[in-house]
């Protein structure tokens, strides 16, 4: 069969395998490529290259494949620490996840931790693959494991009763030892992923937002703010808000320029200069955002999930405690904040991931799932994500 060229006509979805070490995440990834992509063997996926995201080195393997309905980019990480870092930094975005649980072992500590992380970082949907079912002869035992997985998902506010759970064996699929537990299960799994994991809204369809990187004044024209449009579309003549650091102000975009050409609009992905009416050069600064009125609010207090770099990763050499005051780098600027650790957490060691409360000294345009770096004097010591806003 001739290799078809990559068509951009199908919706694109980013997913990943999560779950406990040795439960079969990488074997499952290989098995999916066998039936839906260009086959990648276990060792090709397992030898994941290192990447850097927000100053943190992470090993992730990327494969792609497609079903009749969608094109998928799939990430698989070799080690548990890579999952933690990947999910917190958003190095590889996940619109949904396949949770792999060994039927022979049931849910294990990392199963729980990955579900919790998925909740904290806002992974929208999870589908479960109950792997190694060829090692379990007892149907009642399988039902017990399934029940345990559903209870665990519900505990972390996923709809445990509705989530599709597919029983199979990645190894059987790779070795063709059982069609039912192998190929059929993999095809059932991808049907479930197709139907249960929602297609993400494209950035261009979301409300307009552009982080401000720079401000210029052009004599006779007014003030220009530049940056890369993160999402949505801005049209000349539209009203926008400037949010963060200072009190929110409204203004009108009177011009949009890209590569020195005047445009009638800027859209997600474009690096633009926006000419804004009635705003002085000193009224607007890097670190604020330009956005659709009412779409984003400034906040100072939030709950976050963060990963703290190890000494070897260039992070701190010592632990920190409640009242730690680093800088939080949101989008384009650093803001000092005070950390409050949860009850029962005495201190945080380099290499830990932790839930914490943060109070910033000035408000920043913020919403759930916004990512940030934790820095000390310009050096990255951690990465985090806003899990919920307090005020």
UniProtKB/Swiss-Prot annotation:
It is found in: Cytoplasm. Its main location: cytoplasm. CDD domains: EF_Tu, EFTU_II, EFTU_III. Residues 55-59 are annotated as: G2. It is an enzyme of class 3 (hydrolase). Keywords: Cytoplasm, Elongation factor, GTP-binding, Hydrolase, Magnesium, Metal-binding, Nucleotide-binding, Protein biosynthesis. Residues 131-134 are annotated as: G4. Residues 169-171 are annotated as: G5. InterPro entries: EF-Tu_GTP-bd, EF-Tu_GTPase, EFTu-like_2, EFTU_2, G_TR_CS, P-loop_NTPase, Small_GTP-bd, T_Tr_GTP-bd_dom. Residues 76-79 are annotated as: G3. It catalyses: GTP + H2O = GDP + phosphate + H(+). GO terms for molecular function: GTP binding; GTPase activity; guanosine tetraphosphate binding; translation elongation factor activity. Mg(2+) binds at residue 26. GO terms for cellular component: cytosol. Residues 10-201 form the tr-type G domain. HAMAP family: EF_Tu_B. NCBIfam families: EF-Tu, PRK00049.1, PRK12735.1, PRK12736.1, small_GTP. Monomer. This is Elongation factor Tu. It comes from Brucella canis (strain ATCC 23365 / NCTC 10854 / RM-666).
